[in-house]
């Protein structure tokens, strides 16, 4: 690759680094082209799975202000640039690696933190944002239902007490 081509690749990678919400690094040695295509399809439209030279990835990451990826850039490395829900992308990579042993998750970068392989795999165990929001909404609804029951129970209890007193007075008379 000639220098102008390398500069163009670095510029593209730098742009991807700057626009990504998260980055995962994987070793793809042993994966076939159809397997890589399948992985790209599973990752979805908001995620790109890019194979590039480690030196170019290293330069682009530094230009984008991301430090600490050097240790992870050894051997054949593919970079997964994620826009949006990076937890879901981590789950997709983890599940794909389970069925395709050739894919090895090396680590990642999300929310300003560099993760090693174990850290990146732990991200896959977290609940996604939509799941957390659904649980939160369910908790709020349950709390509101309990409050409505309690507010309704007070007048009902008062009415029952008054009824019991009235019946007691009628029997006494």
Swiss-Prot record:
It comes from the Bacteria. One of its GO terms (cellular component) is large ribosomal subunit. Coiled coil: none annotated. It holds the Pfam family Ribosomal_L10. Keywords: Ribonucleoprotein, Ribosomal protein, RNA-binding, rRNA-binding. Gene3D superfamilies: 3.30.70.1730, 6.10.250.290. Signal peptide: none annotated. Belongs to the universal ribosomal protein uL10 family. Part of the ribosomal stalk of the 50S ribosomal subunit. The N-terminus interacts with L11 and the large rRNA to form the base of the stalk. The C-terminus forms an elongated spine to which L12 dimers bind in a sequential fashion forming a multimeric L10(L12)X complex. NCBIfam families: PRK00099.1-1 (NF000955). This is Large ribosomal subunit protein uL10. It comes from Bifidobacterium adolescentis (strain ATCC 15703 / DSM 20083 / NCTC 11814 / E194a).
């Amino acid at each position: 690759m000639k220098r102008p081509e390398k500069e163009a690749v670095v510029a593209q990678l730098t742009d991807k680094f700057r626009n990504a919400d998260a980055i995962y690094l994987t070793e793809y040695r042993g994966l076939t082209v159809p397997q890589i295509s399948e992985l790209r399809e599973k990752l979805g439209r908001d995620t790109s799975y890019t194979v590039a030279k480690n030196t170019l990835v290293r330069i682009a990451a530094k230009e984008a202000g991301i430090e600490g990826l050097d240790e992870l850039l050894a051997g054949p490395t593919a970079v997964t640039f994620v826009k949006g829900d990076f937890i879901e992308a981590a789950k997709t990579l983890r599940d794909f690696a389970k069925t395709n042993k050739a894919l090895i998750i090396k680590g990642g970068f999300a929310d300003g933190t560099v993760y090693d392989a174990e850290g990146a795999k732990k991200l896959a165990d977290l609940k996604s944002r939509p799941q957390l929001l659904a649980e939160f909404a369910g908790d709020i609804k349950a709390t509101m239902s309990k409050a409505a029951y309690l507010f309704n129970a007070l007048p009902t209890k008062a009415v029952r007490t008054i009824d019991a007193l009235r019946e007691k007075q009628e029997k006494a008379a």
